[in-house]
């Protein structure tokens, strides 16, 4: 059973530190958010990476709404570089069944330099956490 330490909570998203796996986990709650409130949440993810010295994020985005084009651009040009500087190297994305949301998330991830951040897509949290264990067993997470 994972031991999740709450790092940040809002109406839109919860951010946890998984003390068993030494990863940051996010759970989007199905409340539409964009612009500054959305960016503040993503900045809290960077804070969690820095605080816990983690390199892996598992984002449960099944309840996430479409990301606006302005926010997509901000993620690519501002958030990703700062997250990488904070130690971000791997992301597992548990995707929404909404085709538009899935497309937006994959578009952003595929545009960022894959030599810096490794991305995998999953249908379930258990599959994503198994992937984390494989990375850690291979000694690749640092």
Segments the model singles out, each with a brief description of its role:
Residues 1-142:
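Amphipathic, Lys/Arg-enriched alpha-helical "gate/interface" segment within cytosolic domains
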């Amino acid at each position: 059973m994972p031991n999740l330490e709450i790092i940040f909570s809002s109406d839109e998203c919860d951010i946890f530190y998984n003390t068993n796996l030494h990863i940051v986990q996010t759970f989007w709650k199905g409340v539409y958010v964009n612009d500054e409130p959305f960016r503040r949440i993503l900045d809290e993810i960077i804070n969690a990476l820095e605080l816990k010295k983690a390199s892996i994020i598992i984002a449960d985005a099944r309840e996430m709404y479409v990301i606006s084009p302005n926010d997509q651009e901000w993620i690519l040009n501002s958030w990703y570089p700062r997250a990488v500087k904070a130690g971000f190297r791997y992301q597992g994305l548990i995707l929404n069944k909404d085709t538009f949301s899935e497309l937006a998330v994959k578009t952003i991830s595929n545009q960022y330099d894959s030599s810096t951040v490794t991305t995998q897509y999953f249908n379930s949290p258990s599959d994503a956490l198994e992937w984390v264990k494989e990375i850690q067993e291979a000694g690749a997470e640092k």
